[in-house]
């Protein structure tokens, strides 16, 4: 039987959650946050709490179905951005909207 469910397809993970670098941070976070809030997860591979928090954030972003997106940034590979945003411990999470950080923990 043909499925006639005409609701839009859910956004793919690649549209909702992505890794970024110093080279793509402006486009992935600042520019993208003009239209939808962006959750930025600052993490490192050696960080135990990051391994717990990251998947929880990803699940929440998927559940929001496109109302918010997530960008992950490895602070070991993006030390300049981490310094500019004064990231002093990880995991650190910021919410960007309209090009600006609006909240964080």
Regions found by a protein language model. Name each.
Residues 75-77:
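Conserved SAM/SAH-binding loop
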Residues 1-66, 79-80, 90-92, 96-105:
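Proteins that catalyze or organize thiol-disulfide redox chemistry
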């Amino acid at each position: 039987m043909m499925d006639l469910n005409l609701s839009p397809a859910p956004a793919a993970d690649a549209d909702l959650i992505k890794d970024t670098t110093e080279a793509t941070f402006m486009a992935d976070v600042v520019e993208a946050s003009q239209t939808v809030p962006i959750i930025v997860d600052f993490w490192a591979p050696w960080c135990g709490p990051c391994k717990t928090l990251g998947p929880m954030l990803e699940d929440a972003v998927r559940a929001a179905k496109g109302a918010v997106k997530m960008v992950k940034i490895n602070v070991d590979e993006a030390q300049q951005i981490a310094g500019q945003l004064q990231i002093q411990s990880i995991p650190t999470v910021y919410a960007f909207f309209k090009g600006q950080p609006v909240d964080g923990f």
